[in-house]
């Protein structure tokens, strides 16, 4: 894997194999039995899945050496965010997404509330 040493690759692959074994050890519940029995089996299966997910996160965070908690994203103050469509925005709906324009002063069009 790019940017990693051979030793950490082996550790990561071992961790992935362990996680795969954990998930394989908890197959889907059987569809036989009464409605209540099926419901109980599904409930217990979901609880085991949650435990396996938690264990998997702990294994990966140990191997990768970082926290599984996301790093908080610093956002600019909402009162300074404006929509800037002075450039050709297009109609695809995807252009300009991901890079908000921050203007110190709001455009006069947004402040006046009247059409010209």
Swiss-Prot record:
The RNA-binding motif binds to the RRE, a 240 bp stem-and-loop structure present in incompletely spliced viral pre-mRNAs. This region also contains the NLS which mediates nuclear localization via KPNB1 binding and, when the N-terminal sequence is present, nucleolar targeting. These overlapping functions prevent Rev bound to RRE from undesirable return to the nucleus. When Rev binds the RRE, the NLS becomes masked while the NES remains accessible. The leucine-rich NES mediates binding to human XPO1. The keyword Protease does not apply. Residues 18-26 are annotated as: Homomultimerization. GO terms for biological process: mRNA transport; viral process. This is Protein Rev. Belongs to the HIV-1 REV protein family. One of its GO terms (molecular function) is DNA-binding transcription factor activity. The modification Phosphoserine is found at residues 5, 8, 92, 99. It comes from the Viruses. HAMAP family: REV_HIV1. Keywords: AIDS, Host cytoplasm, Host nucleus, Host-virus interaction, Methylation, mRNA transport, Phosphoprotein, RNA-binding, Transport. Escorts unspliced or incompletely spliced viral pre-mRNAs (late transcripts) out of the nucleus of infected cells. These pre-mRNAs carry a recognition sequence called Rev responsive element (RRE) located in the env gene, that is not present in fully spliced viral mRNAs (early transcripts). This function is essential since most viral proteins are translated from unspliced or partially spliced pre-mRNAs which cannot exit the nucleus by the pathway used by fully processed cellular mRNAs. Rev itself is translated from a fully spliced mRNA that readily exits the nucleus. Residues 36-47 have a biased composition (Basic residues). It is found in: Host nucleus, Host nucleolus; Host cytoplasm. A motif (Nuclear export signal and binding to XPO1) lies at residues 73-84. One of its GO terms (cellular component) is host cell cytoplasm. InterPro entries: REV_protein. HIV-1 lineages are divided in three main groups, M (for Major), O (for Outlier), and N (for New, or Non-M, Non-O). The vast majority of strains found worldwide belong to the group M. Group O seems to be endemic to and largely confined to Cameroon and neighboring countries in West Central Africa, where these viruses represent a small minority of HIV-1 strains. The group N is represented by a limited number of isolates from Cameroonian persons. The group M is further subdivided in 9 clades or subtypes (A to D, F to H, J and K). Asymmetrically arginine dimethylated at one site by host PRMT6. Methylation impairs the RNA-binding activity and export of viral RNA from the nucleus to the cytoplasm. Homomultimer; when bound to the RRE. Multimeric assembly is essential for activity and may involve XPO1. Binds to human KPNB1, XPO1, TNPO1, RANBP5 and IPO7. Interacts with the viral Integrase. Interacts with human KHDRBS1. Interacts with human NAP1; this interaction decreases Rev multimerization and stimulates its activity. Interacts with human DEAD-box helicases DDX3 and DDX24; these interactions may serve for viral RNA export to the cytoplasm and packaging, respectively.
């Amino acid at each position: 894997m790019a940017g990693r040493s051979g030793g950490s690759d082996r550790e990561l692959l071992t961790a992935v194999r362990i996680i795969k074994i954990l998930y394989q050890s908890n197959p889907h519940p059987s569809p036989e039995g009464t409605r209540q029995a099926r419901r109980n089996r599904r409930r217990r299966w979901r609880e085991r899945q949650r435990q396996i997910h938690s264990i998997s996160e702990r294994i990966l965070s140990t191997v990768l050496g970082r926290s599984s908690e996301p790093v908080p994203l610093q956002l600019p103050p909402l009162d300074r965010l404006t929509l800037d469509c002075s450039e050709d925005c297009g109609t695809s709906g995807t252009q300009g997404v991901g890079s908000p324009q921050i203007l110190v002063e709001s455009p006069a069009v947004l402040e006046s509330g009247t059409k010209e």
